[in-house]
């Protein structure tokens, strides 16, 4: 409780009388005896509706977000009886609670970000791969890494599934505290635009902030690209970051580099020059075995050999290399361990036939679910294609509909054969989603529409030969499909392996 006093004594003097609190939560269903319940207004659900339930379940303290005007007065009156009874739960109205919650949670969990090396990775695409590569590489060099992000949270290789890329302000601080307790000395954390806009990754001590790229996504939330970019930039301009690594091949990255003179620039362009510290590729060659990257940097020159697939992984590898160099790792050891790096589940992941691998197409599963990511995935797959390139994709329901025709146009341009299928339709009519997708094709008659995702994958594998490549885009590591409000088990990898 003492750790909370700097934040709460000014709000209410009686806080000093409270017994030590056990846990901190935003979910009233998780409240146990002696816990601290935080009631935020929320974007969809007002958590203050559940204050009574939290109190009944044994909450020792409630922090409720204060509104302006009548609502605050009503809340104050409603819970005055609890605050008059010194033996009962206390309810404190806190102005701007959402904005300062990360700081309160940090104090509650003894500021765990100060006890390990924390790397925050943001960008539309490449967050997961870059974060996973950073953590994996750190482990190869003798460290003990944890990760937080799209694939899950936990020690590297032992993650638990997470609901959001960036959890709540409380979850982020609690996870970091757990990692410290488990002995982690490093954490690579994906920082989403939602998390930044909602102050969920706020009161953290970042040893390094990484920017991968910016392209269209989440405009159902941010409304404009400018608002989306500004949310991302907060990690570099407003939060506590000791060093920054930015992608200089990205237009927004170049704009931000001009504002951040001490940042490190990463480029895959051999002609790139800058006054910043840098890591750049000077020559890149692809093969069925992976990629070979000759590079120059402010730390020295060398060559990376990796089993990863695709041109965009060149940038991911160089980004991870730059980040670890900034953090003080030895360049020769990084080069030596690079061939041991493995790809990330659902990120250009190869599915190999266990029956007859020599006579089957190469099947790649990738999480690409934005126009930019699909373009990069198809370009990457083309580098390894001797015959025809198939693209199987769909678009999620109840999400940005504007990207659907854009993704269709990209698939038509870059693939030889396209099968449009269902992704996660959620509560939206899959026929409406498909109509939006088909609006993006010039020659609709050449597109196969197969709503059933398993049947779409089966059809492509039956049609393709051993020189062809099949890209199954959109779901990546996910092992479910959301139809209506229900999650059904479905894995692109399992389905492809079944028919190979």
Curated annotation (Swiss-Prot):
Q: Where does meso-2,6-diaminopimelate bind?
A: 399, 423-426, 474, 478
Give binding positions for ATP: 123-129
Q: What are the binding positions for UDP-N-acetyl-alpha-D-muramoyl-L-alanyl-D-glutamate in this chain?
A: 26, 28, 43-45, 164-166, 192, 198, 200
Enumerate the catalysed reactions: UDP-N-acetyl-alpha-D-muramoyl-L-alanyl-D-glutamate + meso-2,6-diaminopimelate + ATP = UDP-N-acetyl-alpha-D-muramoyl-L-alanyl-gamma-D-glutamyl-meso-2,6-diaminopimelate + ADP + phosphate + H(+)
Q: Which cofactor does it need?
A: Mg(2+)
Kindly state a single biological-process term from the GO annotations of this entry.
Answer: regulation of cell shape
Q: Which residues are annotated with the PTM N6-carboxylysine?
A: 232
Q: Where is this motif: Meso-diaminopimelate recognition motif?
A: 423-426
- Molecular-function annotations in GO: ATP binding; magnesium ion binding; UDP-N-acetylmuramoylalanyl-D-glutamate-2,6-diaminopimelate ligase activity
Q: Which UniProt keywords apply?
A: ATP-binding, Cell cycle, Cell division, Cell shape, Cell wall biogenesis/degradation, Cytoplasm, Ligase, Magnesium, Nucleotide-binding, Peptidoglycan synthesis
Gene Ontology CC terms, in alphabetical order: cytoplasm
What family is this protein classified in?
Answer: Belongs to the MurCDEF family. MurE subfamily.
User: How is this protein named in the record?
Assistant: UDP-N-acetylmuramoyl-L-alanyl-D-glutamate--2,6-diaminopimelate ligase
Gene that produces this protein: murE
């Amino acid at each position: 409780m003492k750790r909370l006093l700097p934040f709460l004594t000014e709000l209410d003097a009686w806080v000093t009388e409270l017994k030590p609190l056990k846990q901190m939560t935003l979910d009233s269903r998780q409240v146990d005896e002696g816990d601290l319940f935080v009631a935020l207004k929320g974007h969809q659900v007002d958590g203050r509706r559940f204050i009574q339930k939290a109190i009944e379940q044994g909450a020792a303290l409630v922090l409720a977000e204060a509104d302006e005007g009548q609502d605050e007065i009503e809340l104050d009156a409603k819970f005055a009886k609890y605050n008059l009874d010194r033996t009962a739960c206390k309810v404190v109205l806190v102005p701007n609670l959402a904005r300062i919650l990360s700081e309160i949670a940090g104090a509650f969990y003894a500021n765990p970000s100060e006890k390990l090396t924390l790397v925050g990775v943001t960008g539309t695409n490449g967050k997961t791969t870059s974060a996973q590569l950073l953590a994996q590489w750190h482990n190869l060099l003798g460290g003990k890494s944890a990760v937080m992000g799209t694939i899950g949270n936990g020690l590297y290789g032992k993650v638990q599934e997470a609901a959001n890329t960036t959890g709540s302000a409380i979850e982020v601080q609690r996870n970091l505290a757990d990692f410290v307790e488990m002995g982690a000395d490093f954490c690579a954390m994906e920082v989403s635009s939602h998390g930044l806009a909602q102050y969920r990754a706020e009161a953290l001590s970042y040893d390094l902030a990484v920017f991968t790229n910016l392209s269209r996504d989440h405009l159902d939330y941010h409304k404009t690209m400018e608002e989306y970019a500004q949310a991302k930039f907060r990690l570099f301009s407003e939060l506590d970051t000791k060093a920054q690594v930015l992608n200089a091949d990205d237009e927004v990255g170049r704009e931000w580099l001009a504002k951040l003179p001490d940042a490190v620039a990463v480029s895959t362009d051999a002609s790139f020059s800058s006054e910043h510290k840098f890591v750049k590729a000077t020559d890149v060659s692809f093969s069925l075995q992976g990629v070979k990257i000759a590079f120059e940097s402010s730390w020295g020159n060398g060559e990376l050999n990796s089993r990863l697939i695709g041109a965009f992984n060149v940038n991911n590898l160089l980004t991870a290399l730059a980040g670890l160099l900034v953090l003080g790792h030895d360049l020769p050891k990084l080069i030596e361990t690079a061939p041991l790096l493995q790809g990330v589940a659902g990120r250009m992941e190869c599915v190999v036939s266990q029956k007859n691998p020599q006579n089957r197409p190469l099947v790649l599963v990738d999480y690409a679910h934005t126009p930019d990511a699909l373009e990069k995935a198809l370009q990457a797959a083309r580098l390894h294609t001797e015959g025809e390139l198939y693209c199987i994709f769909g678009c999620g329901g109840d999400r940005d509909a504007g990207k659907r025709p854009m993704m269709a146009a990209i698939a038509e341009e870059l693939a030889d054969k396209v099968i449009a299928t269902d992704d996660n339709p959620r509560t939206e009519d899959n026929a409406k989603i498909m109509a939006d997708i088909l609006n993006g094709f010039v020659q609709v008659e050449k597109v196969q529409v197969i709503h059933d995702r398993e049947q779409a994958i089966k059809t492509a594998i039956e049609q393709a030969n051993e020189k062809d490549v099949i890209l199954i885009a959109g779901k990546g590591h996910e092992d479910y499909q959301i139809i209506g409000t229900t999650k059904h088990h479905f894995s692109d990898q399992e389905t492809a392996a079944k028919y190979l």
